[in-house]
Every structure is written in structure tokens, then in C-alpha cells.
Amino acid sequence: VSGCNEEEYDRVARRLIKEIREESPKRLILLDGLDVGSRPLMTVRDIPHIAQCGRGYQPMLISHYAASWVYGDKPMYFHKEKLSWPLEADGKRYDRDFLLNTLKDAWKPWTDQGGLLFVGEFGAHNQTPHDVTLRWLADLLGVFKELGIGWALWNMSGSFGIMDSGRKDVAYEDFHGHK
């Protein structure tokens, strides 16, 4: 959730959770984190059977490389030859430790109190070089495992997916009509 304050989000979330609970009292409910899933909504820690959803798109330069919609009609620019994982950019080093610390620091207040975290959205755009994507994903999935975080890719099929992604740097096999 982006663009609303915590009080507003809490009020709406509680109302929706109340309605769901009337139909299914023990259902696990996934609640999107604040600021596009980058941090927890701590005010709901008193509600049983919920998990909050984070994102796994850091750094955006890797996950959304050359995605036209990120900065309006101009895709983010970075020399493709310099795109790597680990990555040095803007005077910073992006590596496994960066991924670990970014997730752990943002969600520690929630998980330290027993809150469940599920990264319900992550992946790399088809313009990110395949070898870079694989190294980044290996580190990211390792961090999820280390922190005990459940996960789901943004999509199975499409520009962030593992099938029908339109990548030009992968030799595809046919799988039931998909590549």
C-alpha cells in the first residue's frame, strides 16, 4: 500500500479483516505492508491469523532494469555492460548482505514480535541480463530461506516470469505450448 497513512490503512484493514472473519474466523489473511510492501503495519499485531506481505525488488536497478513504466516514459538508464550482481552503483555496493540487511531491518519490528512475513512479489524484468538475474535470485532466495520467509514470484508467465518472458538471452524449451 502506498499513498495512505498508517491510521487510515489500519482503519480500512481492520474493517476488511472483520468482514472476512465473519465468514472464515481462522483464515490466514495476507495484509500488504506499508509503502508498497517495504515495511510492516505494526498497529495490527493484535490481530490473530494474519501475515504481512513484503516485496523483493531491491535494488530496483536489477529487478526493473529498462522497465519503461518505472520512471514514466523513460526507462531507467544504466550501462548494460556495467550491470552485474553483486552491483556497484551510486557509490553503494549491492550484494547478498544488502538484501539480508534491507529485509531484516525493515521487518524486524514485526518478526521479533512473532509476526509472519511473506514476500508475495519479486522477480526480475526480462531486460535484466539472465546471468545477473540468476545470481541475484540465488542470493535473494537464500536470504528468504535464512530468514524463514515464504515467497511467490510476481508472475510465472510474462516479462518477470520464468515462462514466456520474452527474454532474448535464454535458450527456451517448449513446455506444453510455453517457452
Locate the predicted segments by residue.
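Active-site region of glycoside hydrolase catalytic domains
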Residues: V1-R93, K104-A124, E146-I149
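Non-membrane alpha-helical structural segments and their capping/turn regions in soluble enzymes
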Residues: E6-R14, R96-L100, D131-L134, A138
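Phenylalanine-focused residue identity feature
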Residues: F78, F98, F118, F122, ...
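Aromatic-rich peripheral "rim/lid" segments of glycoside hydrolase catalytic domains that contact
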Residues: P129-K179
